[in-house]
Each structure stands twice: as C-alpha cells, then as structure tokens.
Amino acid sequence: KYNNNRVLVICNTVRRCQDIYNRLSEKMKLQRSDSSHKLIDDRELNMLHGKYIYADRVEKEKAILSFGKIDEDGTKDNRKGVWITSAIAEASLDVDFDILITELSDVNGLFQRMGRCYRKRSWTGEGHNCHVFDGGKKKCSGVGYNIDEGIFALSKEKLKEYFKTSPSKLK
C-alpha cells in the first residue's frame, strides 16, 4: 500500500537529515545490486536543508517543487521517491507528497509539516499517510537546541492524550 509514492521525510536538524540520507543512500546502493529489489532503481532520493550554499539551495528548491507538484485537478506525475529535508520544508514550499514521515518538533510545526502531504487532494487510501516519530524514551533531534524542551514535552503529551482518547482520529 505504500509502494510507488512520493515520500517526504522531515527532520528537526540538518545533521539528522544528512544522517538519514546517507543511511538510506547506502541501503539503496545495496538493494540496487540485488536483483530482487529492481523497483528501487526508478525511485529518486534527494535531500534539502538550509546549509547548502545559495545557488545549490535554489536548485534543490526548484527540484523539490517540481517533484512535489500536483496539478489543479489533483493529478500528479509518475515520479516516485524520497525527499529528506530539514524543517525548511515545513513552510513556504507549495508541495504535495503522498506520505509524510517526520520527527515531532512541536504541534505548530507538526501541523505545518502535515500540510505538505495531500495538500490538494483527499486521502482515500488504506492505512496512514502521516507518521510522527516522537523520540520514544529519548528526545528527537534538536530538542533543547532549536526546539524548546518544555514545548516539545507538552506537544508530545497532548498528542499522545488525543490519540489515546480518540483512536479513530488516526485515519
């Protein structure tokens, strides 16, 4: 159910963004050499964060806008793959991805991030198309650095409370 999609991964820090990109890139290279994983070959893997030099960042932004474009009638092209980004993608980019995987930052940031997934379409698929990593017993990247610890903890607590009392809202 998650094949052939455009996936957006949003990380709280550039370091986490680069780490995930590098790990996935290595995994894709390994899978490309294995004939049982041919589908991986026609998927794109890209990264965008705020530490690129200006010219490179402009090119990356053009590329993600092209990749995440949906026509007014809700039609998307046949491209598929993964964009791994820092929080730069949560605002000001008019993109529409199929699947969102994100670290929790705070509720405001989470709503912005969710707005990059099925932006101009209605979700009609099975399962979930937004996945939020809350850090478990550890903190997500950036907490205590660019994300206030108190706001993060409150956001995490309230989200867990909400979904605990409203499990049907998960769809």
Per-region residue spans from a language model:
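Gly/Ser/Thr-rich loops at beta-strand to alpha-helix junctions
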Residues: 13-17, 88-90
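C-terminal helicase lobe and adjacent C-terminal extensions/tails of nucleic-acid helicase motors
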Residues: 4, 15, 19-76, 97, ...
